[in-house]
Amino acid sequence: MIDKSLFELPGVRRMFPILGILAVFQFIAIAGQALFLATAITKLWQGQLFSHTIPWVLGFFACFLSREIINFGRSKALDKLAYQLATKLRGDMLDKFFRLGPVAIANLGSGSAATTVITGIDQVENYIKLILSKVLNMMIIPMLILIPVYFLDWQSGIVLTLTFPFAIIFMILLGYAAQGRAERQYKTFQYLSNHFLDSLRGISTLKYFGLSKDYSNSIYKTSEDFRKETMGALRIAMLSTFALDFFASLSVAVVALFLGLRLMSGDILLFPALAALILAPEYFLPLRDFAS
């Protein structure tokens, strides 16, 4: 789920408690949105004037605004941390290359070394920006959302509790498949980088012996192999997202069906049914956000 070596980077361990607190505040905003909106709709359904629902509508928008502020503040903090770590990693990597000398570059491949320093560090920066908050949100927010759902309607809580592990299992299985394809794709990318840079270095020699056109076909074949590996990894990633969306949509549909039938039979009031139904998609949102 998360690379444990990430915790060895400076500042990451200090960021985790902050992100955890922000996740709790985000849950409070989510729960407030659901309760305020359900209350306003219930009052309108009961025939009350819209002016009587204004405090609840304002409460809903206040929670919505709080949620956006939390997301903005978290993004800014993670952007700053990721930039600092990426800058440090790039400097450390360049220092290590200079210390080890040309032998290390030759073993790794000059093209691979160049792409690692340039694009590889950028990918690490994006990884830090995304993974820390997504992992904590997935671990904290769904579990907290279950608390009000069980208070509102325990049957909906059971449905959500039972479907969550199945989505996790499918994510793990498809994740392992995507990991294998991604590793093969990265190896092909390394080979392509080294192959292309070696070609640039020896282009004059290739022209001298009249082999430049033949060598261009070799580069094309390598790039096609890289394209196929990339598309294969993307197909598995898309399948993972589709499977997760299917489980999430199916779970919310089951909750909505049960709530609708019980509303018709008079076994549940409108307010708890609406609040539970609004919270159901929010329960799966951190998981879907992590999978994307």
Where are these regions (language model features)?
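Helix-loop-helix
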Residues: 43-56, 148-162, 239, 243-292
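Hydrophobic/aromatic residues in alpha-helical transmembrane segments
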Residues: 33-37, 58, 74, 78, ...
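Cytoplasmic coupling helices
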Residues: 76-95, 136, 160-204, 211, ...
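Transmembrane helix-loop-helix hairpins at lipid-water interfaces of multipass membrane proteins
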Residues: 13-70, 150-155, 267-270
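An intracellular "coupling" helix at the cytosolic face of ABC transporter transmembrane type-1 domains
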Residues: 8-14, 102-106, 119-128, 132, ...
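Transmembrane helices of ABC transporter permease
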Residues: 19-25, 133-184, 257-275, 285
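Membrane-integrated ABC transporters
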Residues: 1-30, 50-55, 74, 78, ...
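Hydrophobic alpha-helical transmembrane bundles that constitute the permease/transmembrane domains
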Residues: 24-32, 65-72, 124-127, 131-143, ...
